From Swiss-Prot:
Belongs to the D-alanine--D-alanine ligase family. One of its GO terms (biological process) is regulation of cell shape. NCBIfam families: D_ala_D_alaTIGR, PRK01966.1-4. Its cofactor is Mg(2+); Mn(2+). InterPro entries: ATP-grasp, ATP_grasp_subdomain_1, D-Ala_lig_Van_CS, D_ala_D_ala, Dala_Dala_lig_C, Dala_Dala_lig_N, PreATP-grasp_dom_sf. Mg(2+) 2 binds at E317, N319. It comes from the Bacteria. Binds 2 magnesium or manganese ions per subunit. GO terms for cellular component: cytosol. This is D-alanine--D-alanine ligase. It comes from Prochlorococcus marinus (strain AS9601).
Length: 355
């Protein structure tokens, strides 16, 4: 970097969550973006891989995983942190980092865990803080806050793990679902991403298996009424001033937008989405309002439902560490808005330094 020191980016990826492989794919994209010609004068990058057991690998070993994923990710020779080594933040690998870029999707990362840990390094990080991350991960708490702000959402019910352990209580739950919601309904673990653990339920007999599946991932369970909708998404970047991207739509071919649809299907991505300008404006306004409500800044992707019959907007959820894979909407939205991936990652670092 002419006239100054290059910023060293600490890219953290992997993690002991169900979204481990998605995180690796996202990290590959971001790693290459920082290595690009337009960024090499400004940045150096160090990769830090966390395996599925929660052990951190050294930067050289981590980089090899991003270059050659066939490397054995769980037996790489050098570990810089494990359960017996708690002073890892003093390690040489960490001392040289100027800005952290966590790309841990799901629990133990996107939920604010990594943000709390990295706070002790006293180095800036890309993305929002602990509170915004935790609220963005917890679908139920998110919905409660949105309800208080009168932000439109689909009808929903909330249950806890222990509710399913008593037969009488369980029967009451089923009765409540049948009384208050119309089929189909979607049963979701409150703390999960990439549609993992979610089931589409079309009749009474499918309710209990779906609840059991969801509580296998998280003890808090969300049940939402399903509507005939379009999947609409909006990107957010910024701090004191939040900027919105073009609006995008995912036109998926499967019955609903599940994990396979997100990462293993040839979905049609439409950017900008073919919607009325008034609806687009309202979606952007709700996106900013919802991020402000949860103290979310840095970057995020805000997901909406647009009911096909009425064009009514429903806020679905906010993703505080959206995917950066080849199929991910977030970088596509910003590319359509004038920021290529190389420019986007640099912009996110600049935002983190502007706090």
């Amino acid at each position: 970097m002419i006239g100054g020191k290059k910023k060293c980016i600490g890219l953290i990826f992997g993690g002991n969550s169900n979204e481990h492989e998605v995180s690796i794919s996202s990290a590959k994209t971001v790693f290459q973006a920082f290595k690009s010609e337009i960024n090499k004068e400004r940045f150096t990058i160090r990769a830090f891989y966390i395996n599925k057991y929660g052990d951190w690998l050294d930067s050289d070993s981590s980089e090899k995983i991003l270059i050659d994923e066939s490397k054995n990710k769980n037996t790489t020779k050098k570990q810089i942190f494990n359960q017996e080594k708690i002073n890892f933040l003093d390690g040489v690998d960490f001392q040289n980092v100027d800005v952290w870029f966590p790309l841990l999707h799901g629990i133990n990362g996107e939920d604010g865990s990594i943000h709390g840990l990295l706070r002790f390094t006293k180095k800036p990080l890309v993305g929002c803080g602990i509170i915004g991350s935790a609220l963005g991960m917890d679908k139920i708490l998110m919905k409660i806050i949105f309800s208080n702000l009168k932000i439109p959402q689909v009808n929903y019910l909330v249950f806890q793990n222990q509710d399913l352990n008593d037969e009488e209580v369980k029967n009451k739950l089923i009765h409540e679902i049948l009384k208050k919601l119309n089929f189909p309904v979607f049963v979701k673990p409150s703390n999960s991403g990439s549609s993992l653990g979610i089931s589409k339920v079309i009749n009474k007999s499918e309710i209990i298996p779906a609840l059991e599946k969801a509580r296998g991932i998280d003890p808090s369970i969300l049940i939402e009424e399903g509507l005939e909708v379009r999947e609409i998404e909006c990107g957010i970047i910024g701090n004191s001033k939040l900027l919105t991207s073009e609006i995008g739509e995912v036109n998926y071919k499967s019955d609903w937008y599940d994990y396979n649809s997100k990462y293993h299907s040839n979905n049609k991505i439409i950017i900008p989405a073919e919607i009325d300008s008034k609806i687009s404006k309202e979606i952007k306004e709700i996106a900013i309002k919802s991020c402000r409500a949860l103290n979310i800044f840095g970057f995020a992707r805000v997901d909406f439902f647009l009911e096909k019959s009425s064009n009514k907007i429903f806020l679905n959820e906010i993703n505080t560490i959206p995917g950066f894979t080849k199929n991910s909407m977030f970088p596509m939205l910003w590319k359509a808005s004038g920021l290529k991936i190389e420019q986007l990652v640099a912009k996110l670092v600049d935002i983190s330094l502007d706090l």
